[in-house]
């Protein structure tokens, strides 16, 4: 979805219409033995919270243009606190949500979101931080993928991937080990901050 590193203040829209140029259609869940499954994996660097102070800061969502009611998933930074919110539609509930406290500021960190049937796991830097029991089976949609809409946030997003199955912890750890991409193919006017190679392998605290 995002192969390299992009400025998180600039929106990109990943079309799900295969007839549109540049579209990257996401295959629906493989529906393996455990039923509906899919995962997202990405890197984030949050510079500060002064940008858009008091407003929700958009990371990405898959759904409709205004991010409501279709969010499968939807990921946001809290308006004032260093918290990451993840939303997931299910067949019984529009707004299943989890909040992860103490998101690092000024450091790269990795997030993986794995959905399997009626539960959702969120890993930070390869460590399971929350398992959420959804109210019903997760509900996918055919909407586009919106990255850093509504002004996004102050920082960067890198190596965002989609999997049509629930990735095992071994794949999560591979994604963590690979680190963020340091190139900037998108229209970012400034280079990303210097990356200390060991920032992203330390345990999330």
Predicted features and spans:
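Extracellular glycan-associated modules
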Residues: 1-205
């Amino acid at each position: 979805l995002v192969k390299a590193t992009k400025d998180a203040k600039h929106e990109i829209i990943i079309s799900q219409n295969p007839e549109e140029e540049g579209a990257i259609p996401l295959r629906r869940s493989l529906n393996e033995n455990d039923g509906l499954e899919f995962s997202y994996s990405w890197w984030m660097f949050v510079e500060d919270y002064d940008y858009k102070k008091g407003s929700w800061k958009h990371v990405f969502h898959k759904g409709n243009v205004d991010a409501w009611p279709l969010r499968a998933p939807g990921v946001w930074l809290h308006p004032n606190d260093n918290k990451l919110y993840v939303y997931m539609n299910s067949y019984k509930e529009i707004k299943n949500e989890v909040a992860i406290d103490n998101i690092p500021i000024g450091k790269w960190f990795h997030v993986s979101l794995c959905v399997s049937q009626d539960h959702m796991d969120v890993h930070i830097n390869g460590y399971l931080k929350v398992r959420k029991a959804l109210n019903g089976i997760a509900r996918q949609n055919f909407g586009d993928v919106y990255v850093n809409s509504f002004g996004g946030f102050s920082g960067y997003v890198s190596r965002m991937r989609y999997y049509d199955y629930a990735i095992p912890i071994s794949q999560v750890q591979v994604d963590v080990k690979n680190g963020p991409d340091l190139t900037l193919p998108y229209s970012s006017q400034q280079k990303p901050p210097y990356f200390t190679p060991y920032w992203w392998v330390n345990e999330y605290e």
